[in-house]
Amino acid sequence: MTAPTTAVRSLLRFITCGSVDDGKSTLLGRLLYDAGMLPDDQVEALLRDSLRQHPGGDVLDFSLLTDGLDAERQQGITIDVAYRYFHSARRSFVVADCPGHEQYTRNMATGASHADLAVVLVDARKGLLPQTRRHTYICALLGIRKVVLAVNKMDLVDYQQDIYEPIKDAYSELAAQLGITAVHALPVAALGGDNVGTSSKHMPWYDGPTLLHLLETIHVEPIQAADFRMPVQWVNRPDQSFRGYAGTICGGRVKAGDEIVVQPGVHRARVARIVTADGDLPEAHAGQAVTLTLDREVDISRGDVIADATRPAPEADQFAAHLLWMGDEPLLPNRGYWLKIGAKTINARVTSIKHKIDVNTQASLAAHRLELNEVGYCNIDLDHPIAFEAYTANPTL
């Protein structure tokens, strides 16, 4: 294993996605192996599992490291999102291995919602498939702007550059149409480790970095809202002398003395204290869990948003939004639903579906319902106003 180090490493959250059988789990398992993150006993267990799954074989089946569910191992596919945590000498990683089958697209979307970057796999024999386009569209919808394109199974096409290049060009064109600003492409053969952790001797025509080196060095700026926002998770009232409002800051920063507004609404106050388990802070920023006390009593409940008084979030009880429908039953206009945003849950109705989107062509199509895994642009009506922002500005709100 990699020698322990006390150096502070940056953290990269990424997903592996693409169509079924493109080799996502194998690639991720190989990446863990090449990063030196598999202890000897786990390698021995992997060898036993590989022999059990492939009697008479002599190659490690790296997909078994991440395909944890029995149903997945038996079918040779990924159903659930498998999360792994590992590090190299330069960086720490949280990776979500996402399922490739269309019926599990909602699982993939869940993984993508927490990722800074996507590693999209394409089988060199098949090129771009509908599910490749679907996953790329969802990544773009959820704010992922940098993608690593891994054209896998190059060993099965004799490592030919003239097969790799058209796939790279076609994907780059698709990504540009969806607003993905950077595509880093490389040819790999996950089973043998070509260009995963070490450069491939079979593809001298490729002189770029390996996948591991690319993940270690790529610069990704996560979405960070500039304006202060904190959804209230609970009102902390241990006794009559203390009333605080606890939550995790999802945007910007706040200092003692700053003027805030409670949303939805117009009630204003100033921050008296920023309380944590380690004592009071003079200032707090996005990602920190804190308790705020105010200089006067204000009616605040769970789900309200404490925001910068000079730059509050928009408020409305009607708006339009893109929806990726994850329910087994279809979404129908004017049926009652729950809408959860931040720490608030309220009654909602989709008053109309303006159109649904063909994720393969990005065409807008007429629709009267949304089925599982379909994306639509919908008008939404709420019982009362909420504070909200565009996903690209603040994913929490």
Regions found by a protein language model. Give the residues of each.
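C-terminal effector/interaction modules appended to NTPase cores
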Residues: 2-17, 22-25, 88-89, 239-397
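Active-site phosphate-binding and catalytic loops of NTP-dependent enzymes
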Residues: 2-4, 53-58, 67-79, 175-183, ...
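P-loop NTPase switch module centered on the Walker A-proximal segment
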Residues: 3-103, 115
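Residue-level signature of catalytic and energy-coupling elements of molecular machines
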Residues: 21, 27, 46, 76, ...
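Conserved nucleotide-binding/hydrolysis micro-motifs of P-loop NTPases
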Residues: 22, 33-34, 101-102, 125-129, ...
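Alpha-helical scaffold elements adjacent to nucleotide-binding pockets in ATP/GTP-utilizing enzyme cores
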Residues: 27-31, 42-45, 107, 131-138, ...
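Conserved Switch II/interswitch segment of TRAFAC-class P-loop GTPases
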Residues: 91-94, 98-104, 112-136, 142-165
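Canonical P-loop GTPase G-domain recognition
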Residues: 145, 157-227
